[in-house]
Amino acid sequence: MTGTLERNDYIEESKLFFKRIWQGKKPIVKLYKTQSADYLYDTGTNKVLKCKPNVFFLLECLFSTEMDKAIAIFLSRFQEGEFIDAVEKIKVAVEKEGVLLSFGANQFGLSSHYGNLKDLLDSKLSQLTLEVTERCPMRCLYCPYNYSFEYSRNHGERDMSLEVAFKAIDYLKTHSYKSDRRAVTFYGGEPLLRFDFIQSCVEYTKSVFSKTSVDFNITTNGILITQEIANYFFKNNFPVVISIDGPKDIHDSYRKDTHGNGTFNRVVNGLKTLVDTYGDEAANKIILSMVYTPPYSGERIDRIAALWDELPWLPKNLNVNITYPSEGTMPAGILSTENVKEEKDLERWGIETFEKKYSGTGEGHPISDSMEEKKLAMFMQRTIFHEPFDKYYLNGCCVPGLRKIFVTVDGAFRICEKISSKAPLIGNVFEGFTLETIQKAYIDEYEQMSLPLCSKCWAIRLCNICYVQTFRTGKFDIDSKCRSCRGELHSKSRLLKLFSILMEKNPDGLNFLYDVKLE
């Protein structure tokens, strides 16, 4: 009888403890498992804690149903001593780690969006991206500038004038005096249609920033690269982003010229010229931009990865950016059910390949290394709080106009080159930033519309969703954000699991990621 009373007393005491710390709410956390252990990710502190099985199961029960039923379910599987042990460990975690005490976001408020915006935009601009021309000698089937895609401009014929370019460079000069880095990027269309223009911009930038270092880089489809151009890029220390989607048949099925012909051979010629010219610097200065296109399959991913076997001169440690086509850009006829059905998606392939390399059971690959190392580096370098902190970054949004601006051919300012052409402009080279638009549309409205959705989300501290996904229609689109949320949650769940699996195998093996520079 005494034992029963003691048990009931402890259960009642435990209920009072949970009611006191949770006040009838459920903390915002993510419980997940690997094959070897159970884990808790706590949103309030950004911490990951390993849990004993009894602790994990008790938390699962408490989070999934009302308290009396949760405890009854727990005691149907575990002994009373395991219940006491689980509760005591939870008490210690609450007291010493500050976890299980965050119940939702009341504000974003953590990022520079909420500082002195005018002062930041007046002094810390870091990068210009110049839309050198709207013209392009290619017509890739998934290009956002195709007539079938409603959220971007169509293929155009306009070129940026030197007047606009020089005014943009002057603007960078006068608005970057507190910035740690300054860069001018050339974009299109295809910027190499105007190589002379690029040279003029580089020389003007050097004259304006005579005592300050400025980086230059370019994004190109590669078909116009000559030895002269490669030499110029190397001399001026250009990183070059060049587009190639895989072996010839895969690349040529989507990346065509204006006459409908494949472009693989011309791209490879340009790429080979760059690699030879850059020599030992090629791996650090050349970035491949790849688009993973239908029909989706594990076999297709393997064939794309085999590009390095077909081009043995391609550096094995090259950086790679690989993505799916942007939502809505693919021609409707290609998107049949069979084409888009995936038995192994790209992210899963990247995780499996990276995990095998890490554990020594397989070889790595430049694609999987680039995919996973960046995500893991962001997670490793996250801010960890000793107690719940009720301020959060504005998802993955940059501060409009702070890190970079995209300058269109006519001198208008956009947040970046990826955002919809219908999204609100943030200024122009003649008048500067439109602070009111930045504050109202991109900060206040984004927060007001997002907070009800984000406030109860366990991934709010890890989220990479930004203006690109949410301003497709010209104003904040909550439906578009919700579609992105599903994929983001799935991706972050996988990231947590991968991180924990790798730490189980070698706790120090990821330390090199602390040195990865994140933008």
Task: List each language-model region with its residue ranges.
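C-terminal accessory region of radical SAM enzymes
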Residues: E342-E387, K418-N464
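N-terminal [4Fe-4S]-dependent radical SAM core
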Residues: L5-K50, F83-T129, Y177
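Radical SAM/AdoMet-radical enzyme domain recognition
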Residues: A165, I169-T185, R194-P325
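Radical SAM enzyme [4Fe-4S]-AdoMet core and its adjacent flexible, acidic
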Residues: T2, Y254-V268, K272, D276-G396, ...
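Short Fe-S-cluster ligation motifs
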Residues: K167-T185, K481-E519
